[in-house]
Protein backbone atom coordinates (compact mmCIF):
# COMPACT_ATOMS: atom_id res chain seq x y z
CA UNK A 1 0.00 0.00 0.00
CA UNK A 2 2.95 2.39 -0.47
CA UNK A 3 2.33 5.84 -1.93
CA UNK A 4 5.71 6.46 -3.51
CA UNK A 5 5.09 10.01 -4.71
CA UNK A 6 3.29 11.26 -1.61
CA UNK A 7 5.41 13.34 0.83
CA UNK A 8 5.82 12.06 4.38
CA UNK A 9 3.91 15.03 5.94
CA UNK A 10 0.87 14.18 3.78
CA UNK A 11 0.79 10.49 4.76
CA UNK A 12 1.36 11.61 8.36
CA UNK A 13 -1.63 13.98 8.22
CA UNK A 14 -3.80 11.37 6.48
CA UNK A 15 -3.02 8.85 9.21
CA UNK A 16 -3.86 11.41 11.89
CA UNK A 17 -7.28 12.18 10.37
CA UNK A 18 -7.98 8.45 10.00
CA UNK A 19 -7.06 7.73 13.62
CA UNK A 20 -9.22 10.46 15.13
CA UNK A 21 -12.17 9.42 12.94
CA UNK A 22 -11.86 5.82 14.15
CA UNK A 23 -11.57 6.59 17.86
CA UNK A 24 -14.52 9.02 17.91
CA UNK A 25 -16.70 6.41 16.21
CA UNK A 26 -15.85 3.30 18.21
CA UNK A 27 -14.36 4.34 21.57
CA UNK A 28 -17.13 2.90 23.85
CA UNK A 29 -16.16 -0.59 22.70
CA UNK A 30 -12.62 0.07 23.91
CA UNK A 31 -13.95 0.87 27.40
CA UNK A 32 -15.93 -2.39 27.39
CA UNK A 33 -12.87 -4.32 26.19
CA UNK A 34 -10.69 -2.95 28.99
CA UNK A 35 -13.28 -3.69 31.70
CA UNK A 36 -13.57 -7.29 30.52
CA UNK A 37 -9.80 -7.78 30.32
CA UNK A 38 -9.21 -6.50 33.85
CA UNK A 39 -11.68 -8.91 35.46
CA UNK A 40 -9.62 -11.70 37.04
CA UNK A 41 -11.19 -15.15 37.34
CA UNK A 42 -14.98 -15.15 36.95
CA UNK A 43 -15.98 -12.11 34.93
CA UNK A 44 -18.28 -9.43 36.29
CA UNK A 45 -19.88 -9.22 32.86
CA UNK A 46 -21.79 -11.78 30.83
CA UNK A 47 -20.51 -10.69 27.45
CA UNK A 48 -20.06 -7.44 25.54
CA UNK A 49 -23.62 -6.16 25.58
CA UNK A 50 -24.10 -7.06 29.25
CA UNK A 51 -21.00 -5.01 30.02
CA UNK A 52 -22.30 -2.06 27.99
CA UNK A 53 -25.68 -2.26 29.72
CA UNK A 54 -24.17 -2.43 33.22
CA UNK A 55 -21.83 0.50 32.62
CA UNK A 56 -24.69 2.67 31.37
CA UNK A 57 -27.07 1.54 34.14
CA UNK A 58 -24.65 1.69 37.09
CA UNK A 59 -22.34 4.53 36.08
CA UNK A 60 -24.15 6.53 33.42
CA UNK A 61 -23.65 6.78 29.62
CA UNK A 62 -20.83 9.31 30.06
CA UNK A 63 -18.65 6.50 31.48
CA UNK A 64 -18.46 5.02 28.00
CA UNK A 65 -16.33 8.01 27.07
CA UNK A 66 -14.26 8.22 30.26
CA UNK A 67 -10.57 8.38 29.40
CA UNK A 68 -11.21 9.41 25.79
CA UNK A 69 -8.84 12.40 25.90
CA UNK A 70 -5.64 10.31 25.99
CA UNK A 71 -6.75 8.25 22.95
CA UNK A 72 -7.72 11.40 21.05
CA UNK A 73 -4.34 12.95 21.86
CA UNK A 74 -2.70 9.63 21.04
CA UNK A 75 -4.58 8.65 17.89
CA UNK A 76 -3.31 11.51 15.75
CA UNK A 77 0.42 10.74 16.19
CA UNK A 78 -0.19 7.00 16.59
CA UNK A 79 -2.14 6.43 13.38
CA UNK A 80 -0.06 9.05 11.60
CA UNK A 81 3.08 7.10 12.49
CA UNK A 82 1.37 3.80 11.64
CA UNK A 83 0.66 4.73 8.03
CA UNK A 84 3.51 7.16 7.38
CA UNK A 85 6.17 4.85 8.83
CA UNK A 86 4.62 1.86 7.05
CA UNK A 87 5.01 3.74 3.76
CA UNK A 88 8.56 4.77 4.66
CA UNK A 89 9.60 1.26 5.71
CA UNK A 90 7.97 -0.16 2.58
CA UNK A 91 10.13 2.07 0.37
CA UNK A 92 13.21 1.18 2.44
CA UNK A 93 12.74 -2.59 2.36
CA UNK A 94 11.79 -2.66 -1.32
CA UNK A 95 15.02 -0.80 -2.03
CA UNK A 96 17.02 -3.19 0.18
CA UNK A 97 15.51 -6.27 -1.48
CA UNK A 98 15.51 -4.63 -4.95
CA UNK A 99 11.78 -5.07 -5.52
CA UNK A 100 9.45 -2.80 -7.46
CA UNK A 101 6.32 -3.94 -5.67
CA UNK A 102 5.65 -5.11 -2.16
CA UNK A 103 4.98 -8.77 -1.36
CA UNK A 104 2.98 -10.32 1.51
CA UNK A 105 6.26 -11.09 3.31
CA UNK A 106 7.48 -7.50 2.88
CA UNK A 107 4.09 -6.18 4.01
CA UNK A 108 4.43 -8.20 7.23
CA UNK A 109 7.98 -6.90 7.74
CA UNK A 110 7.07 -3.26 7.12
CA UNK A 111 3.97 -3.57 9.29
CA UNK A 112 6.05 -4.98 12.15
CA UNK A 113 8.53 -2.11 11.87
CA UNK A 114 5.68 0.43 11.84
CA UNK A 115 4.19 -1.20 14.94
CA UNK A 116 7.49 -1.00 16.79
CA UNK A 117 7.87 2.68 15.85
CA UNK A 118 4.41 3.74 17.02
CA UNK A 119 4.90 2.03 20.39
CA UNK A 120 7.12 4.89 21.57
CA UNK A 121 4.23 7.34 21.15
CA UNK A 122 1.46 5.06 22.39
CA UNK A 123 2.57 3.75 25.80
CA UNK A 124 2.07 6.80 28.09
CA UNK A 125 -1.37 7.53 26.63
CA UNK A 126 -2.37 3.86 26.83
CA UNK A 127 -1.32 3.68 30.47
CA UNK A 128 -3.41 6.74 31.41
CA UNK A 129 -6.37 5.44 29.40
CA UNK A 130 -6.25 2.06 31.18
CA UNK A 131 -6.03 3.69 34.61
CA UNK A 132 -9.03 5.92 33.83
CA UNK A 133 -11.11 3.09 32.36
CA UNK A 134 -10.51 0.66 35.24
CA UNK A 135 -13.48 0.86 37.62
CA UNK A 136 -11.18 0.12 40.59
CA UNK A 137 -9.10 3.20 39.81
CA UNK A 138 -12.04 5.46 38.94
CA UNK A 139 -12.00 7.34 42.25
CA UNK A 140 -8.22 7.86 42.24
CA UNK A 141 -8.05 10.19 39.27
CA UNK A 142 -10.06 13.30 38.46
CA UNK A 143 -9.55 13.26 34.71
CA UNK A 144 -6.58 12.97 32.37
CA UNK A 145 -4.42 15.81 33.71
CA UNK A 146 -4.88 14.64 37.30
CA UNK A 147 -4.03 11.08 36.25
CA UNK A 148 -0.83 12.22 34.54
CA UNK A 149 0.19 14.40 37.48
CA UNK A 150 -0.37 11.68 40.08
CA UNK A 151 1.45 9.00 38.10
CA UNK A 152 4.49 11.24 37.65
CA UNK A 153 4.42 12.45 41.27
CA UNK A 154 3.75 9.11 42.96
CA UNK A 155 5.44 6.66 40.58
CA UNK A 156 7.95 8.90 38.74
CA UNK A 157 8.10 9.87 35.07
CA UNK A 158 9.36 6.50 33.78
CA UNK A 159 6.21 4.85 35.18
CA UNK A 160 4.43 6.29 32.13
CA UNK A 161 6.28 3.62 30.14
CA UNK A 162 5.21 0.66 32.28
CA UNK A 163 4.10 -2.10 29.95
CA UNK A 164 6.29 -0.91 27.06
CA UNK A 165 7.41 -4.40 26.09
CA UNK A 166 3.90 -5.89 26.10
CA UNK A 167 2.59 -2.88 24.16
CA UNK A 168 5.40 -3.29 21.64
CA UNK A 169 4.44 -6.93 20.99
CA UNK A 170 0.78 -5.94 20.67
CA UNK A 171 1.55 -3.35 18.00
CA UNK A 172 4.17 -5.36 16.14
CA UNK A 173 1.80 -8.33 15.88
CA UNK A 174 -1.32 -6.27 15.05
CA UNK A 175 0.41 -4.23 12.34
CA UNK A 176 2.05 -7.30 10.83
CA UNK A 177 -1.34 -9.01 10.59
CA UNK A 178 -3.17 -5.89 9.40
CA UNK A 179 -0.79 -4.73 6.66
CA UNK A 180 0.13 -8.30 5.71
CA UNK A 181 -3.51 -9.20 5.00
CA UNK A 182 -4.66 -5.95 3.34
CA UNK A 183 -2.64 -6.44 0.16
CA UNK A 184 -3.68 -10.07 -0.19
CA UNK A 185 -7.38 -9.25 0.23
CA UNK A 186 -7.36 -6.29 -2.15
CA UNK A 187 -5.62 -8.37 -4.82
CA UNK A 188 -8.33 -11.03 -4.51
CA UNK A 189 -11.23 -8.56 -4.82
CA UNK A 190 -12.76 -7.45 -8.11
CA UNK A 191 -10.85 -4.33 -9.21
CA UNK A 192 -12.82 -1.17 -8.48
CA UNK A 193 -14.23 0.70 -11.48
CA UNK A 194 -15.56 3.65 -9.48
CA UNK A 195 -14.84 5.67 -6.35
CA UNK A 196 -17.60 3.80 -4.50
CA UNK A 197 -16.06 0.50 -5.54
CA UNK A 198 -12.66 1.62 -4.29
CA UNK A 199 -14.14 2.62 -0.92
CA UNK A 200 -15.90 -0.75 -0.72
CA UNK A 201 -12.69 -2.67 -1.43
CA UNK A 202 -10.72 -0.64 1.12
CA UNK A 203 -13.45 -1.15 3.71
CA UNK A 204 -13.51 -4.92 3.14
CA UNK A 205 -9.72 -5.28 3.11
CA UNK A 206 -9.24 -3.03 6.13
CA UNK A 207 -11.96 -4.78 8.13
CA UNK A 208 -10.56 -8.26 7.44
CA UNK A 209 -7.06 -6.99 8.21
CA UNK A 210 -8.32 -5.49 11.47
CA UNK A 211 -10.01 -8.74 12.48
CA UNK A 212 -6.91 -10.81 11.70
CA UNK A 213 -4.56 -8.41 13.50
CA UNK A 214 -6.88 -8.37 16.52
CA UNK A 215 -6.99 -12.16 16.69
CA UNK A 216 -3.19 -12.32 16.73
CA UNK A 217 -2.61 -9.46 19.18
CA UNK A 218 -5.37 -9.85 21.80
CA UNK A 219 -3.31 -12.00 24.24
CA UNK A 220 -0.65 -9.27 24.35
CA UNK A 221 -3.37 -6.66 24.85
CA UNK A 222 -4.76 -8.56 27.85
CA UNK A 223 -1.28 -8.73 29.39
CA UNK A 224 -0.61 -5.07 28.64
CA UNK A 225 -3.81 -4.04 30.43
CA UNK A 226 -2.92 -6.17 33.48
CA UNK A 227 0.59 -4.70 33.66
CA UNK A 228 -0.48 -1.08 33.24
CA UNK A 229 -3.40 -1.00 35.66
CA UNK A 230 -1.25 -1.76 38.75
CA UNK A 231 1.10 0.98 40.05
CA UNK A 232 4.71 -0.11 40.56
CA UNK A 233 5.79 -0.19 44.21
CA UNK A 234 9.49 0.02 45.05
CA UNK A 235 10.84 -3.25 46.42
CA UNK A 236 7.89 -5.32 45.19
CA UNK A 237 8.01 -7.57 42.14
CA UNK A 238 4.74 -7.18 40.21
CA UNK A 239 2.74 -10.28 39.37
CA UNK A 240 2.69 -9.31 35.71
CA UNK A 241 5.96 -7.88 34.45
CA UNK A 242 7.20 -9.20 31.10
CA UNK A 243 4.86 -10.24 28.30
CA UNK A 244 5.69 -13.89 27.69
CA UNK A 245 5.96 -15.01 31.35
CA UNK A 246 2.69 -13.14 31.99
CA UNK A 247 1.01 -15.00 29.12
CA UNK A 248 2.01 -18.29 30.76
CA UNK A 249 0.80 -17.10 34.20
CA UNK A 250 -2.64 -16.06 32.94
CA UNK A 251 -3.08 -19.22 30.86
CA UNK A 252 -2.05 -21.45 33.79
CA UNK A 253 -4.17 -19.71 36.44
CA UNK A 254 -7.26 -18.75 34.43
CA UNK A 255 -7.15 -20.97 31.36
CA UNK A 256 -6.09 -20.24 27.79
CA UNK A 257 -9.38 -18.53 26.97
CA UNK A 258 -8.55 -15.81 29.53
CA UNK A 259 -5.97 -14.54 27.03
CA UNK A 260 -8.91 -13.62 24.80
CA UNK A 261 -10.94 -11.71 27.39
CA UNK A 262 -12.46 -8.67 25.76
CA UNK A 263 -11.94 -10.12 22.28
CA UNK A 264 -15.51 -9.51 21.10
CA UNK A 265 -15.65 -5.75 21.87
CA UNK A 266 -12.06 -5.42 20.67
CA UNK A 267 -12.74 -7.09 17.33
CA UNK A 268 -16.04 -5.20 16.97
CA UNK A 269 -13.99 -2.04 17.27
CA UNK A 270 -10.77 -2.89 15.42
CA UNK A 271 -12.42 -4.92 12.66
CA UNK A 272 -14.61 -2.09 11.32
CA UNK A 273 -12.03 0.32 12.74
CA UNK A 274 -9.41 -1.16 10.43
CA UNK A 275 -11.78 -0.57 7.53
CA UNK A 276 -12.48 3.01 8.61
CA UNK A 277 -8.75 3.68 8.96
CA UNK A 278 -7.98 2.46 5.46
CA UNK A 279 -10.93 4.26 3.84
CA UNK A 280 -10.24 7.62 5.53
CA UNK A 281 -6.47 7.38 4.99
CA UNK A 282 -6.84 6.69 1.27
CA UNK A 283 -9.58 9.33 0.95
CA UNK A 284 -7.24 11.98 2.35
CA UNK A 285 -4.47 10.82 0.00
CA UNK A 286 -6.85 10.98 -2.98
CA UNK A 287 -7.99 14.45 -1.92
CA UNK A 288 -4.35 15.57 -1.88
CA UNK A 289 -3.82 14.14 -5.38
CA UNK A 290 -6.90 15.94 -6.70
CA UNK A 291 -5.63 19.19 -5.20
CA UNK A 292 -2.30 18.70 -6.99
CA UNK A 293 -4.05 18.10 -10.31
CA UNK A 294 -6.30 21.13 -9.79
CA UNK A 295 -3.35 23.38 -8.93
CA UNK A 296 -1.36 22.10 -11.90
CA UNK A 297 -4.22 22.84 -14.31
CA UNK A 298 -5.08 26.23 -12.80
Curated annotation (Swiss-Prot):
Any Pfam family: Mito_carr
Subcellular location: Mitochondrion inner membrane
Sequence ranges of the Solcar repeats: 6-92, 102-188, 197-287
Residue ranges crossing the lipid bilayer per the database entry: 6-26, 62-81, 105-125, 159-179, 203-223, 267-287
Membrane topology qualifier: Multi-pass membrane protein
Its job: Transports C5-C7 oxodicarboxylates across the inner membranes of mitochondria.
Similarity remark: Belongs to the mitochondrial carrier (TC 2.A.29) family.
Protein name as catalogued: Probable mitochondrial 2-oxodicarboxylate carrier
Taxonomic source organism: Schizosaccharomyces pombe (strain 972 / ATCC 24843)
Amino acid sequence: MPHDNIPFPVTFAAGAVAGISEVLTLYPLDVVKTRMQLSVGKSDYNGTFDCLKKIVKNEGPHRLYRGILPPILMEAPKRALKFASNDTYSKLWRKVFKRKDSSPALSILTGSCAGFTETFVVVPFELMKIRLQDVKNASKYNGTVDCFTKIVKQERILALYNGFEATMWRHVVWNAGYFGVIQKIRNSLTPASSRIGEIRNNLIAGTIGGIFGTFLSTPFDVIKSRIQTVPRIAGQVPKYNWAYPALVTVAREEGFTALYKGFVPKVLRLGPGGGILLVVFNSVIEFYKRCLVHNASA
